[in-house]
């Protein structure tokens, strides 16, 4: 996959003719995947490259930083997902005021100069200054630019529109299963293990204390989750705590994971943490003994859930 990370690089590139999926794609959720998939099908049928034109920063980060929504994934994960979706050319550039000021016509003319022959777009995406570029404009003006338009309606899952906004709401409410259903994969956070206060070890449940890689991630509702953690290319079941440890005063928000059946040193390692189900909300305990008993119950529940999911996965493969 060819990766282009700036407008200057795009202008200088010599690209083969392509069909381009346009979008912020800030979650690469099932709705986004449908737009990309429709564009991919057209590209393969017409011997074109599959391009995705997207942004490495959310548009609001430069236009109205105070309104920028929490991120659903980092850029490294976004690039990885695009590779898995069969993208040939990924234009993943920062959204700047220069782009915001570009008219819809100028934006489409730029795409045509880059060899774009068809455009895939979701019904709710807009582009160009003032958001004047949209599906309606493309459908009425596409012949002027020599473009084929591949539009997709909003996707619904169990009656709910699949959107980054709804996924953020689900995560904030601790409904990570609903978020996963809309994402098409478990919600995942990447982080690097840093030294903690060692309280988990004293309680019999040593934890990896994560410093998140990237800023402004969507943080799930505080509580304990069953999850999985990727360490050195291997997945381990885990129970994950998100919160500020109310039993111990004056703690900042943190994410800590206790990995089952892992006993080596994790300090400095980069981990991918998937949250599968919220087991309970965060609680304050009157004693360390009561906290320890609850942690044992959390571990039992998490391991039972992970075993059940593993069994379902095995049956699905048969």
Q: Where are the regions a protein language model picked out?
A:
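Glycine-rich, Lys/Arg-enriched anion-binding loops that position phosphate/diphosphate groups
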Residues: 142-241
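Residue-level signal for inorganic ion chemistry
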Residues: 29, 82, 119, 179, ...
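Phosphate/ribose-recognition catalytic cores of enzymes acting on nucleotide-derived substrates
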Residues: 196-318
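A short acidic, often aromatic-flanked loop/helix-cap motif at beta-alpha or helix-coil junctions
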Residues: 9-13, 97-100, 156-160
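N-terminal catalytic cores of NTP/NDP-binding nucleotidyl/phosphoryl-transfer enzymes
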Residues: 11-74
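N-terminal Rossmann-like or analogous alpha/beta NTP/dinucleotide-binding catalytic cores
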Residues: 61-145
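Short acidic-hydrophobic, aromatic-tinged amphipathic segments that line or gate anion-handling sites
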Residues: 2-9, 91
């Amino acid at each position: 996959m060819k990766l282009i990370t700036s407008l200057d690089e795009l202008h200088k590139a010599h690209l083969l003719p392509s069909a381009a999926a346009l979008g912020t794609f800030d979650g690469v959720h099932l709705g986004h995947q449908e737009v990309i998939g429709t564009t991919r099908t057209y590209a393969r049928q017409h011997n074109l490259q599959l391009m995705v034109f997207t942004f490495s920063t959310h548009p609001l980060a430069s236009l109205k930083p105070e309104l920028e929504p929490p991120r659903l994934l980092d850029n490294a994960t976004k690039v990885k997902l695009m590779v898995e979706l069969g993208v040939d050319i990924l234009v993943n550039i920062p959204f700047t005021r220069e782009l915001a000021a570009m008219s819809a016509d100028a934006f489409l003319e730029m795409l045509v100069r880059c060899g774009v022959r068809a455009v895939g777009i979701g019904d709710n995406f807009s582009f160009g200054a003032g958001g004047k570029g949209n599906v309606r404009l493309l459908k009425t003006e596409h012949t002027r630019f020599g473009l084929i338009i591949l539009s997709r309606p909003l996707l619904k899952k169990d009656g709910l529109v699949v959107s980054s906004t709804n996924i953020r709401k689900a995560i904030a409410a601790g409904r990570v299963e609903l978020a996963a259903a809309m994402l098409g994969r478990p919600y995942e956070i990447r982080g690097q293990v840093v030294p903690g206060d060692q309280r988990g070890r004293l309680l019999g449940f040593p934890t990896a204390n994560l410093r998140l890689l990237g800023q402004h991630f969507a943080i799930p509702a505080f509580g304990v989750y069953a999850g999985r953690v990727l360490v050195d290319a291997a997945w381990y079941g885990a129970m994950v705590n998100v919160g500020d440890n109310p039993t111990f005063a004056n703690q900042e928000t943190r994410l800590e994971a206790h990995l089952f059946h892992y006993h080596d040193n994790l300090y400095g390692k980069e981990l991918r943490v998937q949250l599968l189900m919220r087991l309970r909300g965060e609680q304050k305990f009157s004693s360390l003994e009561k906290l320890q008993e609850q942690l044992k119950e959390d571990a039992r529940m998490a391991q039972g859930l992970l075993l059940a999911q593993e069994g379902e996965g095995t049956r699905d493969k048969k």
